[in-house]
Amino acid sequence: MATQNPNQPVTYPIFTVRWLAVHTLAVPSVFFVGAIAAMQFIQR
């Protein structure tokens, strides 16, 4: 028990394939939602 430090997880790295997949979808999605929301207020 003394050899396992709970503050240093071994099997959970931060930069994983899941992290990459989430951010490649989330970053453009936030950009497009902001762009579409801004377009709603443009008067012709």
Curated annotation (Swiss-Prot):
One Pfam family this sequence matches: Cytochrom_B559
Residues bound to heme: 18, 23
Spans traversing the lipid bilayer: 17-41
Cofactors named for this entry: heme b
Gene Ontology BP annotations: photosynthetic electron transport chain
Source organism superkingdom: Bacteria
Chief location bin: membrane
Keyword annotations: Electron transport, Heme, Iron, Membrane, Metal-binding, Photosynthesis, Photosystem II, Thylakoid, Transmembrane, Transmembrane helix, Transport
Gene Ontology molecular function, alphabetical: electron transfer activity; heme binding; identical protein binding; iron ion binding
Manner of cofactor binding, per the entry note: With its partner (PsbE) binds heme. PSII binds additional chlorophylls, carotenoids and specific lipids.
Cellular compartment(s): Cellular thylakoid membrane
Topology versus the membrane: Single-pass membrane protein
Entry GO CC: photosystem II reaction center; plasma membrane-derived thylakoid membrane; plasma membrane-derived thylakoid photosystem II
Family annotation (InterPro entries): PSII_cyt_b559_bsu, PSII_cyt_b559_CS, PSII_cyt_b559_N
Complex and partners: Heterodimer of an alpha subunit and a beta subunit. PSII is composed of 1 copy each of membrane proteins PsbA, PsbB, PsbC, PsbD, PsbE, PsbF, PsbH, PsbI, PsbJ, PsbK, PsbL, PsbM, PsbT, PsbX, PsbY, PsbZ, Psb30/Ycf12, peripheral proteins PsbO, CyanoQ (PsbQ), PsbU, PsbV and a large number of cofactors. It forms dimeric complexes.
Family statement drawn from the similarity comment of this UniProt entry: Belongs to the PsbE/PsbF family.
Function: This b-type cytochrome is tightly associated with the reaction center of photosystem II (PSII). PSII is a light-driven water:plastoquinone oxidoreductase that uses light energy to abstract electrons from H(2)O, generating O(2) and a proton gradient subsequently used for ATP formation. It consists of a core antenna complex that captures photons, and an electron transfer chain that converts photonic excitation into a charge separation.
Protein name: Cytochrome b559 subunit beta
Annotated gene: psbF
